[in-house]
Amino acid sequence: MSTSKFAALAVGLVGALATSAAHAESAGNDAEIALLKQQLHLLEQKLDKLQKQSEANAATAASAKAQAKAAETKAASVANASPAIPVKGPIPPSGVVVTMPNNRPTICTADGQNCVAVTSRIHWDVGGYDYRPDTKNTVPQRLDDGENLRRARIGVIGKFLGDWNYALIYDFGGSSDGFGGTASEAGVPVGFLPGGAVSGVENAYLSYTGFKPLGGQLAIEGGILDLPITLGEATSSNDILFMERASSQVIASTMVADDFRSAIGARWFNDVLWAGGYVTGPTTGQVHSASSTNPPGTTEQLGAAVRVAGQVLSGPGYSLHLGADASFLIDPPHNEITGAETLTLADRPELRIDPTQLISTGAIANVSSAQNYGAEIAGTYGPFFFQGEYYWFNVDRNAATGLPPIGAPRLYFDGGYAQASYVLTGETHKYNPAAAAYYGIVPANPFSLAGGGWGAWEIAGRVSTMDLNDRLGTATGIAGGRQTIYTAGLNWYVNGNIRFMLNYLHGDVPKQASATNAADVGSKFDAVALRTQVAF
């Protein structure tokens, strides 16, 4: 209450009392006048007390406001001086925001500059083979039916202060991409996953994206990465057309630039063009040791990989992608005990229910270096999608190990694939410029008995070939086999997180016993498999 209001109230009370006093005096009542004076005195005391209390409250409020303003100014000054906060300005809002983009639990600060999200994928395969060895000398004589938890990954991804990105993802799957086989000591497995490796760390990296040169986005990253060096590898396993990638692309990637790979490098991209290069080491699934027995292993390898790709044409309902890549094994793994430097090129028959590799060069001796070069093409026209890659491999065998064969000539291998799909429900594959590859399908009408949607349905076909034979008929040749596989697929995208994949494969694998022995040890097979996929 203001001083003027107190004064007005006092004047009114005094006037009223004065009137009453005059009336009492006219009546001659002295006692009543005395009582009224006493009441007036008490009211004056109360008014003085209220006025003093109001003035004190106003002073306290003004002091608190001044203190708050000073604290805000000091906090802003400290924040602006900190190197962790590059942009000067007011204090960012406090609190967190919880969201579920594509059903992925995500927590961010209110300014969106710091986030952490949980990510996971489950790929569970069941299937069987009709396997037919050409002769009794063929190895193997049968392939096992059954199931395989192909991938079972869970981890966290996020960012700090907008530009620092990270991921930590572990794979509990039964035949993960980076698992190269169980090592052993004197024929006894050395205590890790059957058919697996010493580590299931699929991603553990840090990436900086603060630089944006030439109107694009630059990512500088290092750690354990999924390297988008081939078109097939740049496509997420959640988005590939078939349960497995083509053998030619798998062999090209696993030489130096697949996932689970230790690497450091950079990639630049905009809406049209992508370019990247990395220096690479071993995968987390490899044992690198100077000893051959304790534990079994070899020294670390050194490699490098580059890729340039882009969407050269795009418009309403259509797109065309072209690209090329190259990978270099600069320093192969070296066994410090035996002196051996070897390289093996091999793959499973585009299905991993049974992990047997039907084509393999075996351990190529005296490898000093190796290279592979690839060309890629992909595109869309409405619901139609196509993709293809072809690879050429060179293996140099002039390492000075002192082991036979000495002075062996260079080896050459090659292979590729072509695949296409048609989405029966009309959706199209969208382009992902950050990886220079295509996303999978997101159904326009997710399956729902209540809502009447049936998801998205896609039919697909692929033919792939890989030739691991060279210099047959000579002592320095390699008889790794030649594999051709025809695959038909049906994909049901239930919603943005669940997919079912049905694949039928027909394979022909002609192979001879060795480079100098033409005895038939080839095989043929048919296989049917179903994948249940959950991802977020």
Q: What are these language model-derived features?
A:
Residues 1-9:
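Bacterial N-terminal signal peptides that target proteins for export
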Residues 13, 23-123, 130-137, 209, ...:
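N-terminal periplasmic/intermembrane-space "pro-region" immediately following the signal or transit peptide
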Residues 19-21:
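N-terminal signal peptide c-region/cleavage motif recognized by signal peptidases
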Residues 32, 44, 72, 202, ...:
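Acidic-residue sensor for enzyme active/binding pockets
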Residues 53, 60, 67, 114-119, ...:
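Residue-level detection of beta-strand scaffold positions
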Residues 89, 100-332, 412-452, 456-473:
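Outer membrane beta-barrel
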Residues 97, 265, 376:
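Short, surface-exposed charged micro-motifs
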Residues 188-193, 208, 326, 336-536:
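Outer-membrane beta-barrel pore domains
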